[in-house]
């Protein structure tokens, strides 16, 4: 059993790609950190746990279906969550969107009272759900997600508009319908309109603040 001094609350935030879940996670982290200090709260992006593909050629890497659960190293993520709950620090992996594989460097994370976990496929894995104290699904219409994704991937990740659209049609939308949307049933809280839903963010802040009392 986890020592009380090391108890770690895990909050999962899931939803479609570009649904606004990262914005909600970063807003909650920033505003709660101002209240309690960064020694008590941390964020783990699921994106960092894409499997290492350094053994594959670039041609093979770009063919990976990044919206399928098999693309994720959830075993490592689970191991890290359990380590944090046991009061042990972890080295978070980082992922390169331009090289399509894991970076060599990592980010050191000490145990925190609250960890915000965010990613598209979190709720598809029962083992991860069992580690969460509660979970959130950001429910944003797919057409809005597509527009946001195109803007983000072209401007921030060096992608072409054609490649973003092709990936959306081939894997992003089908995988959302097959895996991500059905996982919404496991969420404790549904947040519409993404990161612009200030009322929802304030409610979530109040809920999370209870764990610091």
UniProtKB/Swiss-Prot annotation:
Query: GO cellular component annotations, sorted alphabetically?
Result: cytoplasm
- List of residues binding ATP: 15-22
> Which reactions fall under this protein's catalytic activity?
uridine + ATP = UMP + ADP + H(+); cytidine + ATP = CMP + ADP + H(+)
Specify one Pfam family.
PRK
Paired cysteines (S-S): none
Quote the Gene3D superfamilies the UniProt record gives.
Answer: P-loop containing nucleotide triphosphate hydrolases
Note the CDD domains from the entry. UMPK
Look up the record and name the pathway of this protein: Pyrimidine metabolism; CTP biosynthesis via salvage pathway; CTP from cytidine: step 1/3; Pyrimidine metabolism; UMP biosynthesis via salvage pathway; UMP from uridine: step 1/1
A GO term for molecular function: ATP binding
Q: Which EC class, in a word?
A: transferase
Q: Where in the cell is it found?
A: Cytoplasm
Q: GO biological process annotations for this chain's record?
A: CTP salvage; UMP salvage
Q: Any idea of its EC number?
A: 2.7.1.48
Record's NCBIfam families? PRK05480.1, udk
- Which protein family is it in? Belongs to the uridine kinase family.
- Any idea what this protein is called? Uridine kinase
What species was this sequence derived from?
Yersinia pestis
Q: Which gene encodes it?
A: udk
């Amino acid at each position: 059993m986890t020592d009380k001094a090391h108890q770690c609350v895990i909050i999962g935030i899931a939803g479609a790609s570009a649904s606004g879940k990262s914005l909600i996670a970063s807003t909650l982290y920033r505003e709660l950190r101002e209240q309690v200090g960064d020694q008590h709260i941390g964020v783990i992006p699921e994106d960092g746990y894409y499997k290492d593909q350094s053994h594959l050629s670039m041609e093979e890497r770009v063919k990976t279906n990044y919206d399928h659960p098999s693309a994720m190293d959830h075993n490592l993520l689970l191991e890290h969550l359990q380590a944090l709950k046991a009061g042990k620090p972890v080295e978070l992996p980082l992922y390169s969107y331009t090289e399509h594989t894991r970076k060599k460097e990592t980010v050191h994370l000490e145990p925190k009272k609250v960890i915000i976990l965010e990613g598209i496929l979190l709720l598809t894995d029962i083992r991860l759900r069992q580690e969460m104290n509660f979970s959130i699904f950001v429910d944003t219409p797919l057409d809005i997600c597509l527009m946001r994704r195109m803007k983000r991937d072209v401007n921030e990740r060096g992608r072409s508009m054609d490649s973003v659209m092709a990936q959306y049609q081939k894997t992003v939308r089908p995988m959302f319908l097959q895996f991500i949307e059905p996982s919404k049933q496991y969420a404790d809280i549904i947040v519409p309109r993404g990161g612009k839903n200030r009322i929802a963010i304030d409610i979530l802040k109040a809920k999370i603040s209870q764990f610091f009392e």
